[in-house]
Amino acid sequence: MVKFAVVVFPGTNCDFETVEAIKRAGGKAERVWYKDSIKDYDGVVIPGGFSYADYLRAGAIAARQRIMEEIRELAEEGRPILGICNGFQILTEAGLLPGALRPNKIPRFLCKWVHLKVVDVRTPFTYLYEEGEVVRMPIAHAEGNYYIDDPSKVRIVFQYSDEKGSITEEANPNGSVLNIAGVANMEGNILGMMPHPERASHYFLGSEDGLKVFKGMVEWVRS
């Protein structure tokens, strides 16, 4: 069975539900403390939370821990790396994804459900979706305003949209450039996203739209 590491930093708080989402997707997952090794895992998820209490900047301290070098090595081998919310912030701070996550346009914490348009289905995390499919997931962040000088340096995977898939200013909750909610590296094996797919992975949570993210990466490794 394919096995994923769910990395836990001081302040991580979405690790248990991320493990459960991977299990529901048919994979095996283990919580791995950030001081331990992840070299024997098939892929890595950096879940949400407030690593190191967002001191300095969200993700800034976690991105400078030794485990990030192992994550970089796994990424270079082509293994899937997923960063969710704080995990996305950590990936940008570590230079594994271009761009930066800035404070929301309206400087406050946002916790709400949003609609997303699936733009790129050529990644391990999104190939089970249809291009242009509209999905529903929650966000919970204060620094989710994604900025990048040159959007051609990344693959835009998810965009904030209305329920019909229109990319509008009104549908953009945090001011992200081009309504970007998630991006991948050019190779497609590293994905960072601010919405929480693990919180949309079971019908009793209100949506199962996020489960395909985990099913995709599990089946991609298995194949």
Curated annotation (Swiss-Prot):
Function, in words: Part of the phosphoribosylformylglycinamidine synthase complex involved in the purines biosynthetic pathway. Catalyzes the ATP-dependent conversion of formylglycinamide ribonucleotide (FGAR) and glutamine to yield formylglycinamidine ribonucleotide (FGAM) and glutamate. The FGAM synthase complex is composed of three subunits. PurQ produces an ammonia molecule by converting glutamine to glutamate. PurL transfers the ammonia molecule to FGAR to form FGAM in an ATP-dependent manner.
Domain Glutamine amidotransferase type-1: start-end pairs: 4-223
Key words, A-Z: ATP-binding, Cytoplasm, Glutamine amidotransferase, Hydrolase, Ligase, Nucleotide-binding, Purine biosynthesis
Cited CDD domains: GATase1_FGAR_AT (cd01740)
Subunit structure: Part of the FGAM synthase complex composed of 1 PurL, 1 PurQ and 2 PurS subunits.
Classification of source organism: Archaea, Methanobacteriati, Methanobacteriota, Thermococci, Thermococcales
Catalysed reaction equations from the record: N(2)-formyl-N(1)-(5-phospho-beta-D-ribosyl)glycinamide + L-glutamine + ATP + H2O = 2-formamido-N(1)-(5-O-phospho-beta-D-ribosyl)acetamidine + L-glutamate + ADP + phosphate + H(+); L-glutamine + H2O = L-glutamate + NH4(+)
UniProt pathway annotation: Purine metabolism; IMP biosynthesis via de novo pathway; 5-amino-1-(5-phospho-D-ribosyl)imidazole from N(2)-formyl-N(1)-(5-phospho-D-ribosyl)glycinamide: step 1/2
SUPFAM superfamilies to which the protein is assigned, alphabetical: Class I glutamine amidotransferase-like (SSF52317)
Cellular component, GO, one term: cytoplasm
E.C. numbers: 6.3.5.3, 3.5.1.2
Protein's name in the database: Phosphoribosylformylglycinamidine synthase subunit PurQ
Molecular-function GO term, any one: phosphoribosylformylglycinamidine synthase activity
Keyword Nucleotide-binding: yes
PROSITE patterns reported in the protein's UniProt record: GATASE_TYPE_1
Record-annotated disulphide pairs: none
Active site (UniProt): 85, 196, 198
GO biological process: 'de novo' IMP biosynthetic process
Localization, UniProt: Cytoplasm
